[in-house]
Amino acid sequence: MAKEKFERTKPHVNIGTIGHVDHGKTTLTAAITTVLAKKGLSELRSFDSIDNAPEEKERGITINTSHVEYETANRHYAHVDCPGHADYVKNMVTGAAQMDGAIIVCAATDGPMPQTREHILLARQVNVPRLVVFLNKCDMVDDEEMLELVEMEMRELLSFYDFDGDNTPIIQGSALGALNGVEKWEDKVMELMDAVDNWIPLPPRDVDKPFLMPVEDVFSITGRGTVATGRIESGIIHVGDEVEILGLGEDKKSVVTGVEMFRKLLDQGEAGDNVGLLLRGVDKNEIKRGMVLCKPGQIKPHSRFKAEVYILKKEEGGRHTPFHNKYRPQFYLRTMDCTGEITLPEGTEMVMPGDNVTITVELIYPVALNPGLRFAIREGGRTVGAGQITEIID
C-alpha cells in the first residue's frame, strides 16, 4: 500500500509545557497524548519516552527537549517538554523551540513556586503571547478554598508579568488521574485542550509578513548583474519588486530582475525558500554577506538594543570566568557578525557562566534588527551565550 501523504488541513501551532520542577509537566504531556490517542488524534507517548529527552544542539548549546505532536478537532500541535529547569531557560532564550503559547503547570498541593514565576517571566521576555494554566494534582487537595487560593495567586502572578490574569483559562485537573484512565480527569484534559484551542492565538504565517532575506553570499553573472543568495526569512518576493539593501552602514535600493532556485527561474520566492535574487544596478562590491534585503521602509538599521541572554556554563563549552560591564564580544545576528559592547543592569557587577540576564548592547555599526531576533554571542571562536532582542533602543 502506498504511503499516505501528510495533508496539512489544520492550522499548525507550537506550544509547550512550562512550570516548576516536579509539578507534573511531563506527566501532563503524556496524559494529553494518551487522552487524544483514544480519540484517534494522537500517537500515545509514555511518560518515560517523553522524559528521556534527546539532546539537541542549537547555536552551539546542548539542550534536552522532547517533541510530541498531536491534533485537536481544530488544530495540529507540536508540543515541547524539557526535563530540566536549565533546559527550559536555554530553550526559551535561544528560541530552539519557538512557542506560540504555553501551558503553565502548577501543582495545587504547592501553589506557585520560584520556577513558576521564572518561567512566566521568561515567557513574557521572549514574547510568548498567551498562557493557559493547568492546576495539577487536584485529586490530592480536598479543600476547595485551597484550590481557589492557588488559582487567585496564579492570576495575580500572570497579571504582574503583563499577561491577562483575569481572563486566562485555569483548568483544575490531575495529569496522573487522566494518564490512569479516570474519566473525570480525562475530561479535564479535553477541557484543557479546548482552552488551548480557543485562547492561544494562531501565529501569523511567515509568508504573510513583509519580505526579508539575510544575504549569505554574493556573486556576479557576466552580462546579467549581481546575484545575492540566502534563505527568505519572511514574506514573498516577485520579479519586478523593489527591495532595500540594508546594513553595514550602506543602504541602497534596487529592483529584483530574477528569482532563481535550484538553477530554475521562478516568478516568485517565499518564506523558507533558498534563492538567488538578481539585482538591477547593484555592483558586486556594494553588497555583502550580513546585509539584508527587505521590502522598502519595513526595517531600519539600529545599533543599540536590549536583550534577554543565557550565558553558557564552562561544561557547555562557555567561559570559565564571569564577565563584567563593558564586555565586548562578537554578536552573530542572522548571517552577520559584529562587535558589540554589553552594559549590565544597574546593580549587577558581573555575570557568571550559567546565568540568564537582561543586557543592553551597543554594536559598533548599525545593522537591520527587530524585536524577537535571535543571536549568538561568541568570543575567540566559541559560543559563550545566546539570546534574543526584546527591545530596540535606537
Curated annotation (Swiss-Prot):
SUPFAM superfamilies: EF-Tu/eEF-1alpha/eIF2-gamma C-terminal domain, P-loop containing nucleoside triphosphate hydrolases, Translation proteins
Gene Ontology molecular function terms on file: GTP binding; GTPase activity; translation elongation factor activity
Annotated segments matching region G3: 81-84
Top-rank taxon: Bacteria
Main location: cytoplasm
Binding site for Mg(2+): T26
One GO-annotated biological process of the protein: translational elongation
E.C. number: 3.6.5.3
Domain tr-type G: 10-205
Annotated localization: Cytoplasm
Catalytic activity field: GTP + H2O = GDP + phosphate + H(+)
Stretches the record annotates as G2: 60-64
GO CC, alphabetical: cytoplasm
Assembly with partners or alone: Monomer.
General function of this protein: GTP hydrolase that promotes the GTP-dependent binding of aminoacyl-tRNA to the A-site of ribosomes during protein biosynthesis.
Similarity annotation: Belongs to the TRAFAC class translation factor GTPase superfamily. Classic translation factor GTPase family. EF-Tu/EF-1A subfamily.
Descriptive protein name: Elongation factor Tu
Organism phylogeny: Bacteria, Pseudomonadati, Bacteroidota, Bacteroidia, Bacteroidales
